[in-house]
Amino acid sequence: MNKLLLLILFECIIFLSCSGKGSLESEIPKVSLIIDGTFDDKSFNESALNGIKKVKEEFKIEPVLKESSTNSYLSDLEGLKDTGSNLIWLIGYKFSDVAKSVSLQNPEIKYAIIDPVYSDEPIPANLVGMTFRSQEGAFLTGYIAAKVSKTGKIGFLGGIEGEIVDAFRYGYEAGAKYANKDIKISAYYIGSFADLEAGRSVATKMYSDGIDIIHHAAGLGGIGAIEVAKELGSGHYIIGVDGDQSYLAPNNIITSATKDVGRSLNIFTSNYLKTNTFEGGRLINYGLKEGVVGFIKNPKMIPFELEKEIDNLSSKIINQEIIVPYNKESYEKFIKE
């Protein structure tokens, strides 16, 4: 009889031990990250990857990472769901529509999207979007470009024309015109964020036309432009994007218009993991005021006096004394004022 009681007691202990372990593991949320393209773009996607790496280090989690493309979005997101993910990050405006549809289909999963393009339609309660006033940082880099250009001709190289890239373009052009109303600006789009050779080809043409500074927002196409500037040498300059890209061509990159996707991702995810709260159904907007967009200071390329001018402009933007345009319509209005 005593042996039977001991056996039952032992089995109960084993059961409770296993149950406790399962509960503990289930309390640790699983985070996933899906991108369009590759993580090694040295700008936008890589910034998101760096942000999730910091979360991994802080919380000792193993995030699920997925490189995807348009035709695979739904199947890849279904795969992330099957991993047991509690929070799924979608990086880039191309996920705008699919983010809404999967959120509605899976109300038990939290979704967060970077750079969504939404109008006034409702956002599901389990979806949050993060948008950026990229035009504010680009305004500052445009001002710098107009001030340091030797030829009086500067350019913009974009990936795919649309709301996200246009914010960089028109902010940049507005800043340049604010610095020098006579500056000549040319803009080109290569129709892709993944075409390095197209970036090289268009950048080569731009430099041959007398443009000495190119601001890119073209993903891998921008990397191609950086390669061309580096090969051509002195007098051929680039303004990078999203993060500090100066390490790619220290003698040719004047500055970078930063949009710290990784930081915003890190802040939101860390708060979610610490508090287990998720405030969805909304868009969160970041700009200079929040310290998420800006520019990289570079004493080698940007004189101290010019840096002081930029700091003054930053304050005016933060205080809304300057409202930076973000599209063609607001840009045309801005330069007429």
From Swiss-Prot:
Q: Which superkingdom?
A: Bacteria
**What SUPFAM superfamilies does its record include?**
Periplasmic binding protein-like I (SSF53822)
Regarding the membrane, this protein is recorded as: Lipid-anchor
Q: Which UniProt keywords apply?
A: Cell inner membrane, Cell membrane, Lipoprotein, Membrane, Palmitate, Signal, Transport
Which Pfam families does this UniProt record tie to the protein?
A: Bmp
Q: Where is the lipid attached (S-diacylglycerol cysteine)?
A: 18
Quaternary form? Answer: Monomer.
Q: What is this protein called?
A: Basic membrane protein A1
Which organism's genome codes for this protein?
Borrelia garinii subsp. bavariensis (strain ATCC BAA-2496 / DSM 23469 / PBi)
